[in-house]
UniProtKB/Swiss-Prot annotation:
GO terms for cellular component: cytosol. This is UPF0434 protein Rpal_0270. Pfam families: Trm112p (PF03966). Belongs to the UPF0434 family. SUPFAM superfamilies: Trm112p-like. Signal peptide: none annotated.
């Protein structure tokens, strides 16, 4: 069951962002609240957040241009 847009959080817990890193580059991630993604600038990948859970699998990530 997916959350509706109005139920999605606009932020990610700061502690979670401090812990999570890109599995490809081991670099930092940025939260994009509009797309519900964690962005790795180094790997040029956007990891989806589904039902409040970050999906940190490179094969599930969207490639950035």
């Amino acid at each position: 069951m997916s959350l509706s847009p109005s139920e999605r959080p606009d932020t990610v817990d700061r502690k979670l962002l401090d812990i999570l890193v890109c599995p490809v580059t081991k670099g930092p991630l940025e939260f994009d609240p509009a797309r519900q993604e964690l962005i790795s600038r180094g790997a040029k990948l956007a990891y989806p957040i589904r039902d409040g859970i970050p999906i940190m699998l490179p094969e599930e990530a969207r490639k950035l241009g």
